[in-house]
Amino acid sequence: MTMFKTTFRQTATIAVSLISLLVSPMLWANTNNTIEEQLSTLEKYSQGRLGVALINTEDNSQITYRGEERFAMASTSKVMAVAAVLKESEKQAGLLDKNITIKKSDLVAYSPITEKHLVTGMSLAQLSAATLQYSDNTAMNKILDYLGGPAKVTQFARSINDVTYRLDRKEPELNTAIHGDPRDTTSPIAMAKSLQALTLGDALGQSQRQQLVTWLKGNTTGDHSIKAGLPKHWIVGDKTGSGDYGTTNDIAVIWPKNHAPLILVVYFTQQEQDAKYRKDIIVKATEIVTKEISNSPQTK
């Protein structure tokens, strides 16, 4: 019995040491390593596939990791769908006030807002807010129905010079995130450039752009994702996403103190279909790519 206890204790010590060796590289963000090396270490630790794109609008410099590779968007795809509605509202006064009927048969999994409006219906503005701020899946589907289907969102993406984004399915099917499946995917850098164009550029009219930014700033699902990896006084507008294979995503517009805005996209997926979500990886990737700016005296 004594021998077993000693052996168990030694084994446990060795196990803890090995875990420390694996975990500590993720926690230290060694300044002697390049950002790419730090992200690579994080990816190896996570045993998944990580995609990152950061655009610093102060000088338009970029940091990317697997930036050109395709990743399942999951609910981050919703930003483009809502933007497509906003674009149409530029030509149709009062469009956002248009009431959309919601039937019980329309409801799909995770619809915390739309399920409360089966009698009254919701305006396109309300559906857009529910889509972005609560990731309501039925709201997304009603927006897609109004636009004419997922292909219309892809068409809108092309109109703002995004040749990578593609939306093929509705909720919840768009979240299957099967490895190698190009459906409902984009690349981190393509999404970052589109998010920049939509929120800071001229892809939308001024009032539509301001509305999109307001909705993103009011997101309720992002407190433990990109936002958690940033100084608390920075302003963030984001859209999270999750799906099969532990797909864990977040895309954000970030306003650091005394600094031009940042655009950050972090996509992450894993090998097992039922893998757990890893918001900790999103947080750590955020810390790595924004460390230089967050440590600057002017942004503190």
UniProtKB/Swiss-Prot annotation:
The active site is at residue 75. It catalyses: a beta-lactam + H2O = a substituted beta-amino acid. It comes from the Bacteria. One of its GO terms (molecular function) is beta-lactamase activity. InterPro entries: Beta-lactam/transpept-like (IPR012338), Beta-lactam_cat (IPR045155), Beta-lactam_class-A (IPR000871), Beta-lactam_class-A_AS (IPR023650). It is an enzyme of class 3 (hydrolase). Monomer. Belongs to the class-A beta-lactamase family. The class A beta-lactamase family has a specific amino-acid numbering system, sometimes called Ambler or ABL numbering and often misspelt as Amber. A multiple sequence alignment was used to derive a consensus sequence and then the consensus was numbered taking into account insertions and deletions. This allows use of identical numbers, e.g. for active site residues, despite differences in protein length. UniProt always uses natural numbering of residues, hence there appear to be differences in numbering between this entry and some papers. This is Beta-lactamase. It comes from Proteus vulgaris. The gene is blaB.
